[in-house]
Amino acid sequence: MMLGITELTYTALIAFLIVIIIGPIFIPMLRKFKFGQTVRDDGPQTHLAKNGTPTMGGIIMIVAILITGLTRVKVSHDMAVGLICIAGFGFIGFLDDFIKIKLKRSLGLKAYQKIILQVALSFYVAFYQYTSSSSASQLMIPFTDFVINVGILYIPIMMFIIVAIVNAVNLTDGLDGLASGVTLIVSVFFMLFASSIAGNTEVAVLAAATVGACLGFLGFNSYPARVFMGDTGSMALGGAVVAFSVLTNSVLIIPIIGGIYFAEALSVLIQVGYFKATRKRFFKMAPIHHHFEQCGWPETRVVFIFWIITVVLAWISIIAVF
């Protein structure tokens, strides 16, 4: 049975309330057990004042989304895949955060370790979806009524896209309220899309829960942040975006609705490639949100403008699929 906007609003409200109830209890615990963010010296100098801010606050959002998802609808295939994406990628992020903070390894998981875990989970999600849904390999093409059937190539294509999305969302989490605000808007789009065009109640519920969780978390994470989501939260949100798009066969809309994620990841690739080729930097700093900071923009201005851009991209995405 499809849920209307009223029921989805209730769903978002439940997740929101869970976050704002748990937050004031959990954040002091993070501070007590010294789960504080270590700000790197090679980042923007204005961020040094954030050193020691509690991190791994993404756990709050994960708990809220899981509880809401499990209680609002009967759990079947799509809800199970969605929760696995969120909890699974969130757990990889948790390992990364824990190693950084408690084992004092500044970069967390080694790059190959992180990629192996992400690829393994993405293979599970892609393979499970391909073998469980007869329409999984039919990808919707934005701005048209056509779909493209990629057949068995669905698995490697989805693996690449899943890993790319998760890491792009992770890169977006560099300013107070940026990743949570952008993902809130992205989740609103998928909530509307899943509940109307795609006809997928479970994805609509997951998206609504993510809307509520992100909105509640913004109360603690907006500038000046009382807590950071950490890789725990950013990878979990990446897993949520993966679930929304994969389960509605709409991954090709991600470069539009997720344009900020795409720009953040692309800026890093350009910076690294350009530096290797010329020994010079293309941007003043990457990801691109730091470039604008280095240009003199206040952090709050960068975040607000990126939110506005995402709202515009959401409107364009609505035109593309409705």
From Swiss-Prot:
Q: Which residues form a coiled coil?
A: none
Q: Which InterPro entries match?
A: Glycosyl_transferase_4, PNAcMuramoyl-5peptid_Trfase, PNAcMuramoyl-5peptid_Trfase_CS
Q: Where in the cell is it found?
A: Cell membrane
Example GO BP: peptidoglycan biosynthetic process
Q: In which pathway does this enzyme or protein participate?
A: Cell wall biogenesis; peptidoglycan biosynthesis
Q: Which residue ranges does UniProt annotate as crossing the membrane?
A: 10-30, 51-71, 79-99, 107-127, 146-166, 178-198, 203-223, 227-247, 250-270, 302-322
Q: What is its EC number?
A: 2.7.8.13
Q: CDD domains, per this entry?
A: GT_MraY
Q: How does it sit in the membrane?
A: Multi-pass membrane protein
GO terms for CC? Answer: plasma membrane
**What's its top-level EC category?**
transferase
Q: Which UniProt keywords apply?
A: Cell cycle, Cell division, Cell membrane, Cell shape, Cell wall biogenesis/degradation, Magnesium, Membrane, Metal-binding, Peptidoglycan synthesis, Transferase, Transmembrane, Transmembrane helix
Q: Which cofactor does it need?
A: Mg(2+)
GO terms (molecular function) for this protein are:
metal ion binding; phospho-N-acetylmuramoyl-pentapeptide-transferase activity; UDP-N-acetylmuramoyl-L-alanyl-D-glutamyl-meso-2,6-diaminopimelyl-D-alanyl-D-alanine:undecaprenyl-phosphate transferase activity
Catalytic activity, per the record?
UDP-N-acetyl-alpha-D-muramoyl-L-alanyl-gamma-D-glutamyl-meso-2,6-diaminopimeloyl-D-alanyl-D-alanine + di-trans,octa-cis-undecaprenyl phosphate = di-trans,octa-cis-undecaprenyl diphospho-N-acetyl-alpha-D-muramoyl-L-alanyl-D-glutamyl-meso-2,6-diaminopimeloyl-D-alanyl-D-alanine + UMP
> Which domain of life, per UniProt?
Bacteria
Main localization of the protein described in the UniProt heading: membrane
| Family named by the database record | Belongs to the glycosyltransferase 4 family. MraY subfamily.
HAMAP family attached here? MraY
Function comment: Catalyzes the initial step of the lipid cycle reactions in the biosynthesis of the cell wall peptidoglycan: transfers peptidoglycan precursor phospho-MurNAc-pentapeptide from UDP-MurNAc-pentapeptide onto the lipid carrier undecaprenyl phosphate, yielding undecaprenyl-pyrophosphoryl-MurNAc-pentapeptide, known as lipid I.
Q: What is this protein called?
A: Phospho-N-acetylmuramoyl-pentapeptide-transferase
* Species annotation: Clostridioides difficile (strain 630)
Origin organism lineage: Bacteria, Bacillati, Bacillota, Clostridia, Peptostreptococcales
